[in-house]
Design a protein with these regions (language model features):
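Alpha-helical transmembrane segments and membrane-interface helix-loop junctions
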Residues: 2-113, 117-292
Length: 292
């Protein structure tokens, strides 16, 4: 693993004086967007949860051991739950911070020797074709958990634990939206290092992620409309309507109608963005492409 660093001149230190910046949130700050800065600031804020977590852990250990000798209230179940709450919140926000600052774990055996343009292409593929679809999938899965937890007013498994567990599960779902936003901001920033980031390029070069997101939007919109306009009362009932069926494309090869509609909508959006692009920026290359 490598730690991001950046050398900058020291004010008044002469032409050769340099200082190394090792704070991941400050490395490359000049190229970060407002969205990037928001993610970094949230990461810095939630990082303070780790010292709090240490205090809670130490306090729980002390209470547990003192309780064994008859001193104090002993082990507190709510403090056990609190540790997971704090850890979960800090780590999930930290994932978005790591994506924005490129401070996640990476084995640099090959990557470190690549030219800047090749590095950016690998980064773009990893973010938009591998990581972002996974994050969107996690959001979709945890949405069901969060809604079920809210509906049942889920609490702790321990009578003395932290109840209202739906708060944590809802936060997990929202955190995946934050991670998705951080990934998109980083993707757009890196794309600008290679080429002018027209919207049609942003959508096309992130096709799996965009297609998946559009498909989910269509699926939930159609399910909601079905519940409102028909006798369907649940998502299970709504998804039994014809719009959610499969069609045969080839012998033995079926596809969901919602997936095909999402593909058509995605391609239409890309085409519209291409038609409305700023043609004066066609052919503009980013700094890393120029360096290649």
């Amino acid at each position: 693993m490598t730690r991001p660093t950046e050398a900058e001149p020291v004010a008044g230190g002469g032409s050769e004086a340099m200082v190394a910046i090792s704070d991941p949130g400050e490395v490359g700050r000049a190229t970060q967007t407002r969205g990037d800065r928001l993610i970094v600031q949230l990461g810095n804020l939630f990082a303070w949860l780790f010292p709090l977590l240490m205090v809670v852990i130490v306090a729980q250990v002390a209470l547990r051991n003192l309780g064994r000798v008859g001193v104090g209230p002993g082990n507190q179940a709510w403090m056990d739950d609190l540790q997971w709450w704090i850890y979960g919140a800090a780590v999930l926000v930290g994932v978005g911070y790591a994506v924005t600052t490129n401070s996640h774990v990476r084995v640099d055996i090959f990557y470190d020797g690549f030219r800047p343009a090749k590095k950016r292409r690998y980064d773009l593929f990893g973010l938009a074709w591998l990581f972002l679809p996974f994050v969107i999938l996690c959001w979709d899965i945890t949405l069901t958990y969060a809604l079920q937890s809210i509906a049942s007013n889920e609490g702790s498994s321990s009578p003395n634990g932290l109840h209202n567990l739906w708060i944590l599960k809802s936060f997990v779902n929202v955190a995946f939206l934050l991670i998705a936003a951080a990934t998109w901001f980083a993707y757009c920033r890196l794309l600008a290092r290679l080429t002018w980031p027209h919207w049609w390029k942003r959508l096309l070069f992130a096709l799996p992620s965009v297609w998946f997101a559009v498909q989910l939007a269509i699926w939930y919109a159609a399910a909601g409309a079905t519940i409102l306009l028909t006798e369907a009362e649940t998502l299970r009932d709504a998804t039994r309507t014809a719009f959610f069926d499969e069609v045969e494309l080839l012998p033995g090869q079926d596809a969901k109608i919602t997936v095909l509609v999402a593909l058509a909508v995605t391609l239409a959006l890309i085409g519209l963005a291409y038609a409305l692009r700023d043609r004066s920026k066609d052919g503009v290359r980013g700094p890393d492409a120029e360096a290649a």
